[in-house]
């Protein structure tokens, strides 16, 4: 069951990577991250530690893909902020939800969830810096 869930999540991320439009790829990756967050929350409620970890890893990979897609687009966040701002808002929401998840999981899983929250926070800070920088 656990392997099947990982395979399904990886398939979704692989399909997202095939999206040729980098901005749309970023949005789809962040939507996938939100879905992974829902999966992690449900698994946490059910007490399934391995599923929580797999879903949080998927969330981290999705956020990284979203940010890298925006960077690879070559567009300036200052001149074309639409997708950068959307990503910033979604990562802020994910950080808030990860904080709640970190408080809900066991102590052994908390370290991993907090490390992913810190990574999402770093991406969020990078997005804000990209939007706010002058040249």
Predicted regions and their residues:
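Sec-dependent signal peptide recognition
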Residues: 1-7
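Long, charged/polar, soluble alpha-helical segments
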Residues: 8-135
């Amino acid at each position: 069951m656990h392997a099947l869930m990982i395979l399904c999540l990886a398939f979704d991320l692989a399909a997202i990577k095939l999206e040729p439009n980098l901005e749309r790829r970023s949005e789809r990756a962040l939507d996938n991250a939100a879905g992974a967050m829902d999966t992690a929350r449900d698994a946490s409620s059910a007490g399934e530690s391995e599923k929580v970890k797999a879903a949080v890893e998927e969330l981290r990979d999705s956020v990284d893909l979203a940010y890298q897609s925006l960077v690879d687009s070559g567009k300036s966040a200052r001149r074309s902020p639409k997708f950068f701002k959307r990503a910033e808002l979604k990562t802020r929401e994910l950080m808030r939800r990860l904080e709640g998840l970190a408080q809900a999981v066991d102590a052994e899983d908390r370290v991993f969830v907090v490390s992913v929250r810190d990574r999402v926070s770093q991406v969020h800070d990078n997005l804000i810096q990209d939007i706010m920088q002058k040249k």
